[in-house]
Amino acid sequence: MAFTQIQYEKVYATRIIRFNRPEARNCIGPVTHRELIEAWTDFRDDADAKVAVITGAGDKAFSAGGDLKAGAELLPNDPDEIAAHNRGERPGVLGPSRWTDIYKPIIAAVNGVAYAGGLEWACFADIRIAEEHASFGVTCRRWNIGLADGGTQRLPRIIGMGRAMELIITGRVIDAEEAHRIGLVNEIVPSGTSLARALELAEFISTLPQPALRTDKEAAVRGYGRPLEEGLRIEAECFNRSIFDSATIEGLRQFRERDHPDRRTDGAPRTPGIVRS
């Protein structure tokens, strides 16, 4: 795959998808849109790919959103295309941002501004790691351009309706500290280190058994916002799909026989991220 406006890099079981237009604050145009679809399709379908990390080239921008100079080239512009877009049959305006069926983990390494469609792409991820100089905002509010790549749906799910509506309606830009305080960002790291931290986390996630991890993500994504009874039905369906997997049988064996690094030291399971005194 030869790309000109993104970079697609394989690092063991991790795939880095990088917006690569630093001279234009990594904004997304028609070529970027097509290349993003190709890269995300490869990640989704590649059995060896376990985690994706999305980031931006340079040190100024994750992505400033859509390339407004491209104008109508990014948009559905005839009745059939508009109807297909309304039915959810188009992948998104700025790449496959409307896809909801990637159940492999996705980490955003936010290395600068994440504005408008860039914010929407940050929300596409499951985990967001932001550099201390990063900022976030629905800056397209000034130009009378709406959110079309999941922002109106994902942002409220991440930070709650009240906070999301303030950002969506006003277009106010927030810094990394506020983003962390309201739950938009999971972790803040020094400038220039978000990709390294994301790769460290991706490497750890890649060591975990994958089947139940993915069905748990699927259950959370599909069940969110539904009535509790329906969400529990989805959870049961996903659980029953993974519980008899060979990885589960092996995991139970390792637990019973203490044949795992987390079961060999003091007899108690070790919880990642918790330091024992």
Which residues fall in each region the model found?
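Conserved CoA-thioester-binding segment of acyl-CoA-metabolizing enzymes
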Residues: 1-62, 72-74, 277
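Acidic-histidine catalytic/liganding microenvironments
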Residues: 3, 46, 65, 103, ...
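Terminal peptide-recognition signature
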Residues: 17, 21, 36, 54, ...
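An acidic, glycine-rich surface segment that forms the CoA-thioester-binding/catalytic face
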Residues: 33-37, 41, 45, 68-111, ...
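Conserved hydrophobic/aromatic "anchor" residues
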Residues: 40, 62, 136, 255, ...
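Short, active-site-adjacent cap segments at secondary-structure transitions
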Residues: 59-63, 69, 115, 137, ...
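Crotonase-fold acyl-CoA enzyme core
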Residues: 97-213
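C-terminal long alpha-helix characteristic of the crotonase
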Residues: 129-134, 185-237, 241, 246, ...
